[in-house]
Amino acid sequence: MAVKIKLTRLGKIRNPQYRIVVADSRTRRNGRAIETIGKYHPKEEPSLIEVDSERAQYWLGVGAQPTEPVEAILKITGDWQKFKGLPGAEGTLRVKEAKPTKLELFQAALAQAENEPVGEAITPKKKKAKAEDAEAAADAPAEAAAESEAADK
C-alpha cells in the first residue's frame, strides 16, 4: 500500500484550515486517514504550523511520500532537512509573539494612571450651566414686559 502525507481541508469558505495526515494514496482529499500528525492554519499571522516531528520522521522513514505542500511545510519546520540529513535542521518557522498577561496589562494601566495630572475638571459642571439657563429664561420675560410697556407709552 502506497502511503502519502497530505493535507485535509477543514474550516469555512474563506478561512481554510488543514490537518497534516498520513493516508493511503488512493483515498480522496478528505477521506479516511491513518494518522493525523499536525495542523496548518495559513490565514493566521504568522501561519500556525504544528507538526509532530517524531511521527513525521517515522512515516518518512517507512516510505511515506509527502505531497508538495506538505514537503514545503516540513522544510519550514526543519523535519525534511532532519530526514534528509541536510544542514539547517532548525528550519525557518516564525513564532507568534506572546500576548501580554493580564497582570502586565494591569501594571501598565496603574503606571499610566499615576502619571496623569491630578487637578480639577476642565469642563464646567452641568448644574451650574442649568442654573445659568434658568436665570436667563427668568430675565427674558421681564425684559420683554418692560419693552412692551415702553412701546405702549
Curated annotation (Swiss-Prot):
One of its GO terms (cellular component) is small ribosomal subunit. Disulfide bonds: none annotated. SUPFAM superfamilies: Ribosomal protein S16 (SSF54565). It comes from the Bacteria. Coiled coil: none annotated. The keyword Cytoplasm does not apply. Residues 114-153 are annotated as: Disordered. Residues 137-153 have a biased composition (Low complexity). One of its GO terms (molecular function) is structural constituent of ribosome. Belongs to the bacterial ribosomal protein bS16 family. This is Small ribosomal subunit protein bS16.
